[in-house]
UniProtKB/Swiss-Prot annotation:
Its main location: membrane. It is a multi-pass membrane protein. Keywords: Antiport, Glyoxysome, Membrane, Peroxisome, Repeat, Transmembrane, Transmembrane helix, Transport. Inhibited by pyridoxal 5'-phosphate, bathophenanthroline, tannic acid, mersalyl, mercuric chloride and bromocresol purple. Belongs to the mitochondrial carrier (TC 2.A.29) family. Solcar repeats lie at residues 2-91, 109-216, 229-320. The keyword Nucleus does not apply. The gene is PXN. Expressed in cotyledons, hypocotyls, vascular tissues, trichomes, hydathodes, seeds, pedicels, flowers and stigma. InterPro entries: Mitochondrial_sb/sol_carrier, Mt_carrier_dom_sf, SLC25A32-like. This is Peroxisomal nicotinamide adenine dinucleotide carrier.
């Protein structure tokens, strides 16, 4: 079994577990990002308050809205990403060794090369899995109709604040697929792909930071006669790497969520986005810079925890798989 396949499967497994543990936070964060309160008069709910409100008004199950396609998307995304990451990484390492033989470089993959490797893998992943995340975003932001919400809204702003989906229950995966297709055709499944492609810099930064810190840690251990990195150390390295990447690219994530969520159908043009640039300009004009950082504290907690768990489990799965393969080969 190739290293690329081992890393792909391990990444998928780690991603699923991380997703299960942090999904309620992800749902709350997506809802926070897609709030369209232009006047900003209301006090914003904290993460725990928002979560309790969802449970009280809509039930526990809404915290896990879109979980099934999300798990499929996580497995696909992590599998595709890690597979192509390892493929491109192997080529980069081979190129570095070839350059060393010619007297150029020390044979190691530099920071810039690591960034390119992660960017290429991320771009392939985005183009292949974007339709899944459009569906997940729709399901996370869909809200159950209450008796008060079934009446006609008093104003466009109240409709926008609620972001109430008009489809009847149940609102499952196939309902969502039909809604997206009816609204924008096949291209609707690639809404938000431009900011998402730009956001490739997030995992690129994440893996660049992670690989750099991991390499330095291993070198320090090698000087002491050991090359082992503990699960806790991997957890902490993953958390630090994700924190740096998330803070840098968060505004693009908000734009992506706005584009992928169900568009407000009122006559208020301020809340209807024609594309990425239109969304950015309207958010700047009507919400200010604040609009680009809605729910950021929730996202930091969710993404850092998920990334730390993912890295820890992925590395342990890779170690276990290689150990099993080596034992099978020796026997």
């Amino acid at each position: 079994m190739s290293d690329a396949l081992i890393n792909g499967l391990a990444g998928a497994g780690g991603g699923i577990i991380a997703q299960l543990l942090t999904y309620p936070l992800q749902t709350v964060n997506t809802r926070q990002q897609t709030e369209r309160d232009l006047k900003r008069e209301k006090r914003k709910l904290g993460t725990i308050e928002h979560m309790c409100q969802v449970v009280k008004q809509e039930g526990w199950e809404r915290l896990y809205g879109g979980l099934a396609p999300s798990l499929a998307g996580t497995a696909a995304s992590q599998g595709v990403y890690y597979y192509f990451y390892q493929v491109f990484r192997n080529r980069a390492e081979a190129t570095a060794l070839a350059r060393k033989k010619k007297g150029l470089g020390d044979g190691s993959v530099g920071m810039f090369a690591s960034l390119l490797v992660a960017a290429f893998a991320g771009s392939v992943n985005v183009l292949m899995t974007n339709p899944i995340w459009v569906i997940v975003t729709r399901m996370q932001t869909h809200r159950k109709m209450t008796k008060d919400q079934t009446a006609a809204p008093e104003s466009p702003s109240s409709n926008a604040e609620a972001l109430v989906a008009v489809e009847p229950r149940p609102y499952g995966t196939f309902n969502t697929i039909r809604e997206v297709y009816d609204e924008a055709g096949i291209t609707g499944f690639w809404k938000g792909v431009i900011p998402t492609l730009i956001m490739v810099s997030n995992p690129s930064m994440q893996f660049m930071l992670y690989e750099t810190m991991l390499t330095k840690l291993k070198k320090k251990r090698a000087l002491k006669g050991s090359n082992n990195v503990t699960a806790l150390e991997t957890f902490l390295l993953g958390a630090v790497a994700k924190l740096g990447a998330t803070v840098t690219t968060y505004p693009l994530l908000v734009v992506k969520s706005r584009l992928q969520a169900k568009q407000v159908t009122t006559g208020d043009k301020r809340q209807q986005y024609k594309g990425t640039l239109d969304a950015i300009l309207k958010m700047i004009r009507y919400e200010g810079l604040y609009g680009f950082y809605k729910g950021m504290s929730t996202k930091i907690v969710q993404s850092v925890l998920a990334a730390a768990v993912l890295f820890m489990i992925k590395e342990e799965l890779v170690k276990g798989a290689k150990l099993l393969l080596s034992n099978a080969t020796s026997s």
